[in-house]
A protein has these predicted regions:
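Mixed-charge, Lys/Arg-enriched low-complexity segments
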Residues: 7, 78-115
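Negatively charged, low-complexity tracts enriched in Asp/Glu with abundant Ser/Thr
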Residues: 7-49
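Extended hydrophobic/Leu-rich segments
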Residues: 19-26, 39, 67-70, 98, ...
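Acidic, low-complexity, intrinsically disordered interaction modules
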Residues: 35-92
Length: 115
């Protein structure tokens, strides 16, 4: 199970600022934090993802005015993974952003196993 709970050495404000920095680097837009949404995603009765998705408004982005972001631990505790997903249909909610991220991670794992 992936745990997408908030964490940062400097607390919640640093965590939000760190996500804003990643969003600016990846998407070239200033992001304003709007809210935190808890998400639990299950498959066949098992929880496969549980955490909090941060919702940001984007300014001057060519495709959307919203982005979802979170960080989760990896096999290497010193190297957490930051995920950002643009609010572009069919991604229209924090939950759908998590679902898209899970599908993408599954595809990447399959490709790595084949290659």
């Amino acid at each position: 199970m992936v745990d997408g709970r908030r964490f940062s050495e400097g607390g919640i404000m640093n965590y939000i600022q760190e996500l804003q920095d990643v969003i600016r680097k990846l998407h070239g837009s200033f992001a304003r934090h709007v809210e935190t949404v808890p998400v639990v995603e299950t498959f066949n009765g098992q929880t496969i993802w549980e955490g909090e998705v941060e919702v940001f408004d984007l300014h001057d982005h060519p495709k959307t005015d919203r982005v979802y972001a979170w960080r989760h631990e990896t096999d290497n505790p010193a190297s957490p993974r930051t995920v950002t997903v643009l609010h572009v249909p069919p991604i229209t909610s924090p939950r759908k952003a998590v679902q898209a991220s899970i599908v993408q991670a599954f595809r990447e794992a399959e490709a790595n196993a084949e290659g």
